[in-house]
UniProtKB/Swiss-Prot annotation:
It is a multi-pass membrane protein. Belongs to the UPF0283 family. Keywords: Cell inner membrane, Cell membrane, Membrane, Transmembrane, Transmembrane helix. GO terms for cellular component: plasma membrane. This is UPF0283 membrane protein VV2076. InterPro entries: DUF697, UPF0283.
Length: 341
């Protein structure tokens, strides 16, 4: 008896080579039937318009704040005078003493509020100067640029004997337009302030990165970074000749953060990742050091945005300070103190 199995007949249809679909064959699509056109909403201009309203608010808010302060000061003064006169008429010397003491405290408080409002007014004036500078840069006018730059130099605390300022004055002639005069002032005078500001930003950014990299407490990181950021903004404002009060610092920090939100935070992650990959540090830096690098880059970006808001003349493409140089310095600093052996 044979061990061979009986035959099996398969009745399935065998596809020939001609029946197989050709993968590289051309296919025609009807655009109206196959694809549904959709409109992409552009949110970036809306965000920029919102930021413009935050940075340069309408004049109604200015008058409202001044009116409220004047009304409050008048009511406080009226109440103080009325209390003192009533106590003197009634012979209530204890009430008179308390009224005088409270009046002195109220006067000190009103003085501090008035000083803060004055400094906030100076910050608003800076934004109006920037707006005027933008108009002059975009116009073909003649005869206003030199006076505008001289006023900016006076407000910024640039001395007459400053070599850069003196060189700019000797370079200006009647053949230059207002836009050319502003560009020359930016390249000769404001650039010197930018160099000082860049050194300050680099120092504060590397210090913040190093503090976060070696700090064991998260709450300490937050306090240190906040303190360093406020100190950095205060130093930058001094370089550009602007005296900031407490309210002005808060306002400027809010404007800087709003500006950063418009620009987007994804660039920070991409740039930091590229630096880590290029320097072969991704596998050597600890998680804590990575946080330090991120905080340092964020501080540097914060400082650059503060520079953009504090400069009397808007950035020019060829003179704008880039984040790349400061970023490399931050990564190198953190790597030098936290690299694993």
């Amino acid at each position: 008896m044979s061990d061979l199995k009986p035959k099996q007949v398969f009745e399935e249809t065998i596809f020939s080579q001609q029946d197989k679909p050709e993968l590289t064959a051309q296919q025609q699509f009807d655009q109206q039937q196959t694809f549904i056109p959709t409109t992409i909403e552009e949110t970036e201009p809306e965000l920029e318009d919102a930021l413009e309203q935050v940075i340069r608010p309408s004049g109604r808010r200015k008058w409202l704040a001044g009116g409220l302060f004047a009304a409050f000061a008048g009511l406080v003064g009226w109440q103080a005078v009325d209390s003192v006169l009533s106590a003197m008429q009634n012979g209530d010397w204890l009430t008179l003493g308390w009224s005088g003491f409270i009046s002195v405290l109220a006067g000190l408080g009103l003085g501090a509020m008035g000083k803060e409002l004055w400094k906030l007014r100076q910050l608003r004036h800076l934004f109006s100067v920037q707006e005027q500078g933008e108009k002059l840069l975009q116009s073909d006018s003649v005869g206003q640029g030199k006076a505008f730059c001289q006023q900016v130099a006076k407000q910024s605390g640039v001395a007459e004997e400053n070599p850069a300022y003196d060189r700019w004055k000797n370079s200006v002639n009647t053949a230059h337009s207002d836009a050319e005069i502003l560009q020359m002032y930016d390249a000769m005078v404001v650039t010197q302030q930018d160099k000082q500001a860049t050194k300050v930003i680099s120092r504060f950014a590397t210090e913040s990165a190093a503090l976060v990299a070696i700090s064991p407490l998260a709450i300490a990181d937050m306090l240190l970074v906040a303190w360093r950021n406020f100190k950095m903004i205060d130093t930058l404002s001094t370089i550009y000749g602007i005296e900031l009060g407490y309210a002005s610092r808060i306002r400027l920090l809010r404007l800087v953060l709003a500006n950063m939100a418009v620009a987007g935070a994804s660039e920070l992650v991409i740039d930091a990742g590229m630096d880590l990959m290029s320097m072969d540090l991704a596998g050597k830096l600890s998680a804590r050091a990575g946080q330090g690098v991120g905080v340092g880059i964020l501080t540097a970006r914060l400082g650059l945005k503060a520079m953009a808001l504090l400069r009397p003349i808007p950035w020019q493409a060829e003179t704008q300070v880039k984040l790349s140089a400061i970023r490399k310095e931050i990564v190198s600093k953190v790597a030098s103190i936290t690299l694993k052996p």
